[in-house]
Amino acid sequence: MDIIFYHPTFDTPYWINALTAALPGARVREWKRGDNEHADYALVWHPPVEMLQGRDLKAVFALGAGVDSILSKLKAHPEMLPEHIPLFRLEDTGMGQQMQEYAVSQVLHWFRRFDDYQALKQKSHWEPLADYQREDFTIGILGAGVLGSKVAEALAPWGFPLRCWSRSRKTYPGVQSFAGADELPAFLKGTRVLINLLPNTAETVGIINKGLLNQLADESYLMNLARGVHVIEEDLIDALNTGKLKGAMLDVYSSEPLPVESPLWAHPRVAMTPHIAAVTRPAEAVAYIARTIEHLEQGKAATRQVNRQLGY
């Protein structure tokens, strides 16, 4: 069994050694330009077209939760990865716990008004503020897939009203479920904290815009943990400036790294991290990939295959 590996920033020797240990007998090599030798499987992140084109692969694994970089290239180069070759993605592999940590810590930061106290500190002003009430602090999760369900699970013990919205209906204990475009307004109405965990598809690009933000509760909060293209940043800034939004926590941006001239850097109501909310944990990812390859070699069903029409 031959496996080719390509990731522009990962520790390639670690991955090759770990995969070799997890799949005895497998020959794992780093793909470099000009390598047209046989391969059964490809593990990739933002792969060049020539890496996959013309190969009779058994499967391709995207080394992250998103596959938009591959699917966007397929629009221009459909021969890069024919339909009969399955494409898999990493839905969790440690990312779920990281998303839980990020979301819970930020929700509590806002709920306890630490953002307001930090602003008062900048003015050297001492003033105890009125507490927020849990029943008025409804949390809405856009995207109810694996990561969305993990975030809802972590928030449940804190007693906030929880709701989720997705393309097709998902049901989780203690979470009010909304689905489809017709139910989006009802989901947004009264939502105080909006957490975005949507996949990046043609339908979700620009979904968080002026029209959507205006349907949230007054003085609401936005946490974007999915993709920067989901948010129209000009509309976000307008909502912050008018007070419709009280704050935003952003991990992803329309352009990364975020340009130094972006007004997001200096906005007092915007907190930011550099796309680190959930990163691939190598050991867990290797275990999942090895297990999936073993299932495929044995003719068994494998989970987390991407539906190319849906984009996830």
UniProtKB/Swiss-Prot annotation:
Catalyzes the NADPH-dependent reduction of glyoxylate and hydroxypyruvate into glycolate and glycerate, respectively. The keyword Cell inner membrane does not apply. Belongs to the D-isomer specific 2-hydroxyacid dehydrogenase family. GhrA subfamily. GO terms for molecular function: glyoxylate reductase (NADPH) activity; hydroxypyruvate reductase (NADH) activity; hydroxypyruvate reductase (NADPH) activity; NAD binding. It is an enzyme of class 1 (oxidoreductase). This is Glyoxylate/hydroxypyruvate reductase A. Gene3D superfamilies: NAD(P)-binding Rossmann-like Domain. The keyword Cytoplasm applies. It is found in: Cytoplasm.
